[in-house]
Amino acid sequence: MANQTGATRIMEKTNTASESVDVLIVGAGISGIGMAVHLRDKCPGKSFAIVERRDEIGGTWNLFQYPGIRSDSDMHTLGFKFEPWTEQKAIADGPSIMNYLHRIKAKHDLEKHIRFDHKVLSASWSSEEARWTVTAEKSDGSRVEMHANFVYMGAGYYDYDSPYDAQIEGLGNSKGEVVHPQF
């Protein structure tokens, strides 16, 4: 099968959809969104796609919505040079960061590049073909193979399938409410 950069096609012998791009970005959180904008700016002729496990951008800032969630870094540091943080509070809450990311996504027309509900199952490099093959599972259970010359991992460091449940001595004796950001 010939490499058809940017084209989606059905592979002849399987029921797996396939897509080829120059760069595949894994994760549509702050890192993935930032990489997409930099890629468009620095390499405008390169095709790219973003695979996002969830049905929304934002990563941490979308997943964790407990009361009082905020950045522990100022947004002048955490934000992007190409889209300076202009809000009054430098230590931003989660909803403000989500608004910032949505504004960037809209301004740079990134929506059409994002493949929502795609959980990456594997990534393998072929030296013979000089490209990556990434297999992802969609929310309906179907699978898609994506081929790319480069893969950028911006998926963060949380294990969404098995969040860490710290066993803290005496926690059960607490009279206050115990909150875990992933439970």
PLM segments and residue spans:
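Short amphipathic alpha-helical segments
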Residues: 37-38, 62-63, 163-167
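Active-site acidic short loop of glycosyltransferases
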Residues: 18-21, 147-149, 176
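Glycine-rich dinucleotide-binding loop and its adjacent helix/turn
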Residues: 6, 10, 79-88, 93, ...
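N-terminal Rossmann-like FAD-binding beta1-loop-alpha1 element of flavoenzymes
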Residues: 20-50
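Feature captures the FAD/FMN-dependent oxidoreductase FAD-binding
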Residues: 88-160
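Glycine-rich phosphate-binding loop and adjoining beta1-alpha1-beta2 segment
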Residues: 58, 62-79, 88-96
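Basic/polar N-terminal segments that are highly enriched at the extreme N-terminus
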Residues: 1-19
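Glycine-rich FAD pyrophosphate-binding loop
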Residues: 40-66
